[in-house]
Amino acid sequence: MDRRDGYIMNEIMLRAENIERTYHAGSVDVPALKNCTLEFGQGEFTAIIGKSGSGKSTLLRILGSVDEPDTGSVIIAGKKITGMKDKELSEFRRRNIGYIYQDYSLFPEFTAYENVVMPILIDGKKPDENEVDDLLEELGISHCKNK
């Protein structure tokens, strides 16, 4: 059993096996990923770096279940997500995957408060007002709560 920074590193949290993804631009096939296999253990931090067009965003969309590979499989916390039905995948994604886009995606017509509680409401839960206020304070945006 390997220990790093207080984490027990014996459990594979994410595994991608033989991922391939090709985009089709008219009569031209553009391979983005070819035979990509990787795994990440619990508590690991990983940077994915490469030149523009090297497949980083494609890989992250597939690992985050936003896109499907042409071939291969993705397993998160022991559950194979490739090939899941839409409803099951949506539920799994909502409960287990956090995906942050390069450009922030706030709803401009909503207040800061409404943007913060949106995921809680989508999950069918009632937001804890004190927790939301604490979060807004921690983020330094409590003055924007109703803006």
Features from the language model and the residues they span:
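A short, flexible loop at the N-terminus of ABC-type nucleotide-binding domains that lies
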Residues: 10-13, 22-35
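ABC ATPase NBD coupling module
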Residues: 27-30, 81-98
